[in-house]
Swiss-Prot record:
PANTHER family: ASPARTOACYLASE, SUCCINYLGLUTAMATE DESUCCINYLASE. This is Probable aspartoacylase. It comes from Synechococcus sp. (strain CC9902). Zn(2+) binds at H13, E16, H104. It catalyses: an N-acyl-L-aspartate + H2O = a carboxylate + L-aspartate. Substrate binds at R55, N62, R63, E162, Y273.
Length: 303
């Protein structure tokens, strides 16, 4: 089978409905999304979880792409699905794709944002071009041994598109629209790189992952407090000294270690992260100068 430029994956988590619905409409209306002349493969990442309206069946598919799991035989449904996707669409698959876009929604007030895992040059180039076009924030997730095995890491270039807030299992026009615009911006950026007419921004702004924070818990591991009402919904807003972080059931502020000044919380109170004991993650805003070799790496993938 012929190679394709881009693999678009929706429904990696089965209770995130907006991106899969958009792909269904795109299948029915091929002109709905401008592919900018690129060859595209599109699919639902975890159809069994989607049918069950659950994030996953046995384990999180978006943590099932670790090398040690991929090298095993058999295993849980999501482990088998990860191997299936790589075997068909991975760089050495039957229908290899150079770039993967993994489409997600979140219950957190993240707006429309991009997520990178590590500092691969091609990823940085694509994210910088999309940020230049749409102004989207970039969350750079790295150096966190507790969170690994992400789908996009197994392709030569990959971005996660996160859009929220929206409850799990709910379709919302705003989320679909923002997802569609982000997809088209990615396609346009890739097409411009291939054509050689791309204009690189001089800088890219990233929010680099520092770590994650859980709510206070008691001896039984049950939450003893919750995200403070003044913090809820303030993703991307820097912490200030003495900001309240958690509150008790009576509304009183719970004493917590002071957050690093100007650290920036993201994925605040994301529903799916409660099982991972993550109330929010912390980032630091950094401005990086664009490196010419980033674009070279992306251009080589599309040649």
């Amino acid at each position: 089978m012929a190679a394709s430029d881009v693999l678009v994956v929706a429904g990696t988590h089965g209770n995130e409905l907006n991106a899969p619905w958009l792909l269904e409409q795109w299948n029915r209306q091929p002109d709905l999304i401008n592919s900018a002349g690129l060859s595209i493969q599109r699919l639902v990442g975890n159809p069994q979880a989607k049918a069950a309206m659950r994030r996953y069946v046995d384990r999180d598919l978006n943590r099932s792409f670790r090398v040690d799991l991929l090298e095993q035989s058999g295993g849980d449904l999501e482990m088998r699905r990860a191997r299936e996707l790589l075997g068909r669409y991975g760089p050495r698959g039957d229908e290899p794709c150079s770039v993967v876009l993994d489409l997600h929604s979140t219950t957190a007030a993240m707006g429309c944002s991009l997520v990178l895992y590590g500092r691969r040059p091609a990823d940085l180039a694509l994210a910088a071009l999309v940020q230049s076009a749409l102004g989207l924030p970039i969350y750079l997730h790295e150096s966190d041994s507790a969170q690994t095995g992400f789908l996009v890491e197994r392709w030569p270039c990959g971005l996660v598109v996160e859009v929220g807030p929206v409850p799990q299992g709910v379709l919302e026009a705003r989320i679909v629209r923002q997802t569609r615009l982000a997809i088209e911006a990615c396609f346009e950026a890739l097409a411009s790189v291939r054509s050689g007419v791309v204009r690189l921004p001089r800088q890219v702004v990233v929010h680099r992952h520092l770590g994650s924070c859980d709510v206070p818990r008691g001896e039984s591991d049950q939450p003893q407090a919750l995200v403070h009402q003044r913090l809820q919904g303030r993703d991307w807003v820097p912490f200030k000294p003495l900001d309240a972080i958690f509150e008790a059931a009576d509304g009183s502020t719970v004493e917590t270690p002071q957050m690093e000044h100007q650290s920036i919380p993201v994925f605040i109170n994301e529903a799916a992260y409660a099982e991972k004991h993550i109330a929010f993650s912390l980032t630091r805003r950094e401005v990086w100068t664009m490196e010419p070799q980033w674009l070279d790496h992306l251009s080589e993938l599309l040649s």
